[in-house]
Amino acid sequence: MAIKTDIRGMIWRYPEPFVVGREKVREFARSIKCDDAACYDEAAAAELGYDSLVAPLTFVSILAKLVQADFFRNVDTGYTTMQMVQVDQGFTFHQPIKAGDVLYARMEIASVNERFGADIVTTRNILTNAGGDIVLEAFTTMMGHEGDDSVNIKWDAESGQVVRTA
């Protein structure tokens, strides 16, 4: 196992709050071709009972990328070169993400395992608001190996799995 198992149980807090901008919500909604009026128009959001624009569900990917990059930049995981693929992810929204929200992110390393020469890491990712309430809980599973591309993986449509080819 190339990854350091002592990261298991680690809690990584993103160092800065993430402020959800109104124009960022609109820009993101346009980029994914979201046609929900509550993402663009405050009156439409108010009709649904919200006090500001509602971000599309996948908006959280913006912050998730920042948190993950910050973690790998600052934590010695044991990898010097790394090939990694995300193999699973699940979300539980406790409340919507809205323009004006101030969010705080933490990533917990829930498990670190080795299977068939690949390191498998599962993270529990929590977003809280300024009041400390949980907004989102997500679990992400990543598979990686250290070294070059001599070990190849590909998507096998027949089995619905990521498989090794060499």
What do the PLM-derived regions correspond to, one by one?
Residues M1-K4, D88, F93-A166:
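HotDog/MaoC-like acyl-thioester-processing domains
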Residues M1-Q86, I153-A166:
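Hot-dog-fold acyl-thioester-processing enzymes
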